[in-house]
């Protein structure tokens, strides 16, 4: 044992310890690559996974791609080739075809081909339920508030609006260049300035809904008395 530690000491001093010492980390390690950790949606998802995995004796490493396909590919390459990760989880990864790999890859959301397991997140049933609720309540003017990264939810909104309501609803759609509460505030303001508000709004996520509600409150428009709002976060 003394000789072993002396060899390790010399190896460290010469900067070659890691080159020859390749011990396996004792815990099962999961690498998670997600678009961001700043938003409430992704941060809650990351922490929920962390709690469940740690309860099972696993460790979770979290990386963010900042919605960049190139960055996501770089992080995937690192975990696959240069780390001792046991499983890689991709959250809402850009549509891609994975190269052959040895580390198991689980894709959650997104169109990822060649993943070892794929989990599809289907929020359209909840969206349809919300729109049907509005229709049964006698509401007809339904709008949508989103931002640049919620185009898939906008597309789902349009599909379901055409199927349930039909008619002209484009005038009630407002997509902001800003994100989170500022985005919701700006999108609601843009609708207000058009001079015609919808009876109800679907917001792409809850922070947008909060921003929209703040704008309406500041301008004397009560929620839900004058306008109904539903946020579709998770």
Question: Where would I find each of the regions flagged by the language model?
Answer:
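Short beta-strand elements in bilobed, periplasmic/extracellular small-molecule ligand-binding domains
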Residues: 53-65, 141-144, 158-185
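Alpha-helical recognition/docking segments in bacterial nutrient-uptake
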Residues: 27-132, 136, 192-193
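Hydrophobic alpha-helical segments within soluble ligand-binding/sensing domains
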Residues: 113-144, 155, 159, 181-190, ...
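Venus flytrap/periplasmic-binding-protein-like
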Residues: 166, 206, 217-234
């Amino acid at each position: 044992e003394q000789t072993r530690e002396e060899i390790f000491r010399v190896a460290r001093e010469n900067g070659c310890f890691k080159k020859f010492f390749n011990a396996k980390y004792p815990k099962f390690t999961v690498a998670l690559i997600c678009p961001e950790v700043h938003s409430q949606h992704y941060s809650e998802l990351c922490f929920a996974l962390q709690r469940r995995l740690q309860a099972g004796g696993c460790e979770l490493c979290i990386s963010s791609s900042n919605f960049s396909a190139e960055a996501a590919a770089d992080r995937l390459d690192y975990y696959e080739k240069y780390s001792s990760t046991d499983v890689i989880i991709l959250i809402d990864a850009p549509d891609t075809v994975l190269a052959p790999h040895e580390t198991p890859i689980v894709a959650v959301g997104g169109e990822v081909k060649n993943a070892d397991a794929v989990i599809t997140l289907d929020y359209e049933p909840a969206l349809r339920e919300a729109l049907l609720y509005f229709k049964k309540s006698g509401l007809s003017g339904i709008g949508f508030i989103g931002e640049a990264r919620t185009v898939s939810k906008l597309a789902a909104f349009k599909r379901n609006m055409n199927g349930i309501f039909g008619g002209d609803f484009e005038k009630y759609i407002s997509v902001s260049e800003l994100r989170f509460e500022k985005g919701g505030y700006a999108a609601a303001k843009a609708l207000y300035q058009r001079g015609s508000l919808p009876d109800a709004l679907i917001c792409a996520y809850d922070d947008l809904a909060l921003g929209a509600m703040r704008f309406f409150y500041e301008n004397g428009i009560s929620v839900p008395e004058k306008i109904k709002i539903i946020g579709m976060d998770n």
